[in-house]
Amino acid sequence: KSISIEIFGLGYVGFPLTVRLASAGFQVTGIDVNQERIQRLENNKLMDSEIHLEKEYIDCRQKNNIKLESKPSNSTIPKVGIICVPTPIPTKNISSDIFVKSAVESFLNCSKPGDVIILESSIEVGTTEIISNIIKNRGFEVGKNFGVCFCPERIDPSNKEWGIENIPRVIYCSDNSSFDIAKGIYLHVNGGNLLKVNSPKIAEIVKSFENAFR
């Protein structure tokens, strides 16, 4: 699999995704700014809610399919950054997309033409466009030499019937090439069960509606 994947945020969304993609044979770097979390994972210490992934995780580590870092690195092969960081409730001093923007900026520090960002974090309507503008300000042409996708996570921790491996996903991509890359990744997540939409706001509204429904 001739791409490198960096997953930002190793919480209840990013960690299972890291393990699933590494098990499929991808080279995955799990990135988290929480040094304690990185250290615990280096020592194979998982949270109680992750124990069911322990054997699979350790197998992936032994095969060197998972690296753990606090920041991204340069790569000579095409790179995909999947953003799974938390989105806090906004306050007067903190916007809900502060961690998303920080992760994107971090990824862009080591990016090159041909790379792709996939947003999975819960974001407000209009955020994908904001992220696209951040990328453009770095000199990239979104949809031409740099891809942006929004494929909102749909994990419901209490739901035993529907999980990361079988729940359908909605996805927006800036261009067909990025969609092909994303589909190749999610083929190993949920069998590629993706509903493609032609506007980021549609995907954002779908996610907002689901959050409100829950």
Which residue stretches match the model-derived regions?
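Structural/interface elements that position substrates and couple domains in central-metabolism enzymes
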Residues: 1-214
